[in-house]
C-alpha cells in the first residue's frame, strides 16, 4: 500500500494506492482543501511558525506537550479524525481563515512564535500531532487490512513527519 499525504499535491491531498508488479492502482483519494497538510500548516501558522516550512517546529514542540481534553474537544469540533477524515471545517477557506478560526475557537493567540515554555501551545501542538497520527494510522491500517498486506510506503510532505512515521511503523508491525 502506498499512501501519499500532502498539502495539495498534484491532484489529491491524500491518495491511497495498491501496488504490484503491474504498477499502482488508486484505491481512494481526497481532494484539497480537505487536507491533513493544510490542517497541520494551519496550526503551525497559529503558533507563530511559517506554514509550509515550519511544520518541523510544530512537531518538535509537540514533544513538550501533554494530552489536554479541553484543547482536544475544541479541535475535534472542527476536525474529524480517522480514515474518513474531514478538516474542511477548519481549513476549507485557506490558512489565514483557519488561523482566525483557531483564534476564535480558543479565544487566544499564543506567544509568537510559541516556545516549549508555553504549556498551552505545547499542549495544542501535542494534540495536533496526536490527531494527525490517529488519522494516518487509521488510513494505513484500514487499507493494509483490505489489501491483506503489512507493508506501506508513505510519500508527500506530511510523510516527512518522523513522529508520524514511528507511529505508522509500530502499527504496521
What are these regions (language model features)?
Residues 1-173:
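Short acidic/glycine-rich loops and adjacent helix/strand connectors
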Amino acid at each position: 500500500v502506498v499512501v501519499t499525504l500532502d498539502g495539495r499535491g498534484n491532484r489529491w491531498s491524500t491518495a491511497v494506492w495498491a501496488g504490484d508488479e503491474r504498477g499502482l492502482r488508486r484505491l481512494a483519494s481526497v481532494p484539497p482543501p480537505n487536507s491533513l497538510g493544510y490542517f497541520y500548516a494551519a496550526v503551525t501558522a497559529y503558533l507563530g511558525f511559517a506554514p509550509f516550512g515550519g511544520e518541523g517546529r510544530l512537531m518538535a514542540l509537540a514533544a513538550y506537550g501533554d494530552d489536554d481534553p479541553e484543547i482536544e474537544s475544541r479541535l475535534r469540533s472542527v476536525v474529524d479524525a480517522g480514515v474518513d477524515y474531514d478538516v474542511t471545517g477548519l481549513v476549507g477557506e485557506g490558512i489565514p481563515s483557519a488561523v482566525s478560526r483557531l483564534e476564535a475557537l480558543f479565544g487566544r493567540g499564543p506567544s509568537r512564535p510559541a516556545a516549549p515554555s508555553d504549556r498551552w501551545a505545547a499542549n495544542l501542538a501535542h494534540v495536533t500531532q496526536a490527531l494527525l497520527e490517529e488519522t494516518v494510522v487509521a488510513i494505513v491500517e484500514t487499507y493494509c487490512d483490505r489489501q491483506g498486506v503489512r507493508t506501506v510506503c508513505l510519500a508527500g510532505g506530511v510523510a516527512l513527519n518522523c513522529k508520524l512515521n514511528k507511529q505508522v511503523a509500530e502499527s504496521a508491525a
